[in-house]
């Protein structure tokens, strides 16, 4: 925004210079040393002033550089992973060579994606208050830990024995039914469309708020970048990028929690402020949002079960067990 304004002012100044001639006309740009700066462009007949914030400019420039670097790394990882995508198995499963760290982070980032920052933090956080923490605990124990313990080793062994690379192929080989294979493919194709759309929606809204980028531009940009590195490197490209993004997410979550608690004067002060919050549309009970059982414990229980056990059947989650290197890696991945 600041750069756009500067270009607009420069354009007007040069037009004024052109109209009045260049003789004895100069452009002066004066920067103050304080945080509040004023840029003066003297075109001879008029002085244009634009007050800007030095920190704001530097922050936007730094964010832009980091964003471009992130995109470059994503695409670079895609082309780097091409060596693993020389055949169908390599493209879909990375040659079954993904280690425990890559697989664990790929599982985690697929599970705790936009829902953490948009769904849980926004909808569930306000609807249930502090009790929404149970959703995160349930997801971590039931949706992640228990899924790795129950499904990890069995899925890895059976998928390799049946030489299956996808869930529909696994069903077809396991039960000897082409109809089941086709049916599973159709179901996955249909219902993953709104699922994927919700992820792009959440991601684009976050980018839009953070960088003031148009929502449609974010959608197109994310889709194009994802398509490039997925088509170029297949599963291994997504696993490596998920690992990188997982580290960023962990750092971001810790930073957000620390910033929020610091702005509210600590955990107890934040909890006290939450106790004073009220929403007649949810409940009239005072202090209910600070309760660890929340305004609707039964409904919250269903949310925990749905979001924890429901992921056990998602193909993009189960496929992580298809691609992991060996049983030893599954044990390490479970801990990670």
Where do the PLM segments sit?
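Membrane-water interface regions at transmembrane-helix termini and the short interhelical loops
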Residues: 126-128, 151-154, 205-210, 224-245, ...
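Lipid-exposed faces of alpha-helical membrane segments in multi-pass integral membrane proteins
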Residues: 62-76, 139-142, 146, 183-190, ...
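Helix-loop-helix module between adjacent transmembrane segments
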Residues: 135-230, 303-310
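Membrane-interface "cap" regions at the ends of multi-pass membrane proteins
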Residues: 53-119, 230-233, 246
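Membrane-interface helix-loop-helix modules in multi-pass membrane proteins
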Residues: 92-163, 298-310, 317-319, 323-336
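Short, Lys/Arg-enriched N-terminal segments with co-localized hydrophobic residues
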Residues: 30, 38-57
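Hydrophobic alpha-helical segments and their helix-loop junctions in multi-pass secondary transporters
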Residues: 77-84, 192, 196-200, 204, ...
């Amino acid at each position: 925004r600041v750069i756009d304004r500067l270009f607009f002012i420069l354009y007007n100044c040069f037009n004024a210079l052109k109209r009045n001639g260049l003789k004895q006309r100069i452009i002066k740009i004066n920067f103050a040393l304080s945080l509040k700066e004023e840029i003066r462009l003297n075109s001879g007949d008029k002085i244009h002033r634009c007050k800007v914030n030095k920190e704001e400019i530097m922050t936007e420039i730094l964010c832009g550089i980091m964003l471009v670097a992130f995109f470059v790394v994503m695409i670079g990882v895609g082309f780097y992973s091409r060596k693993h995508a020389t055949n169908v198995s390599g493209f879909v499963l990375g040659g079954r060579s993904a280690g425990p760290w890559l697989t664990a982070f790929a599982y985690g980032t697929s599970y705790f994606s936009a829902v953490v920052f948009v769904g849980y933090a926004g909808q569930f956080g306000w609807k249930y208050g502090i009790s929404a923490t149970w959703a995160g605990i349930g997801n971590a124990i039931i949706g992640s830990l228990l899924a790795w313990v129950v499904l990890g080793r069995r899925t890895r062994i059976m998928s390799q024995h049946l030489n299956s690379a996808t869930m529909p192929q696994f069903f077809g080989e396991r039960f000897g039914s082409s109809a089941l294979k086709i049916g599973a493919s159709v179901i996955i194709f249909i219902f993953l469309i709104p699922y994927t759309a919700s992820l792009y929606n959440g991601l684009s809204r976050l980018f839009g708020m953070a960088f003031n980028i148009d929502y449609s531009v974010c959608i197109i940009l994310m889709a194009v970048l994802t398509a490039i590195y997925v088509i170029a490197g297949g599963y291994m490209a997504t696993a490596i990028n998920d690992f990188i993004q997982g580290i960023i997410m962990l750092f971001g979550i810790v930073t957000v929690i620390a910033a929020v608690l610091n702005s509210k004067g600590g955990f107890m002060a934040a909890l006290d402020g939450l106790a004073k919050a009220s929403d007649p549309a949810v409940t009239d009970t005072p202090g209910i949002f600070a309760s660890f059982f929340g305004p609707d414990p039964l409904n919250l229980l269903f949310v925990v079960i749905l979001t924890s056990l429901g992921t056990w059947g998602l193909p993009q989650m189960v496929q992580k067990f298809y691609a992991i290197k060996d049983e030893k890696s599954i044990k390490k991945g479970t801990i990670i």
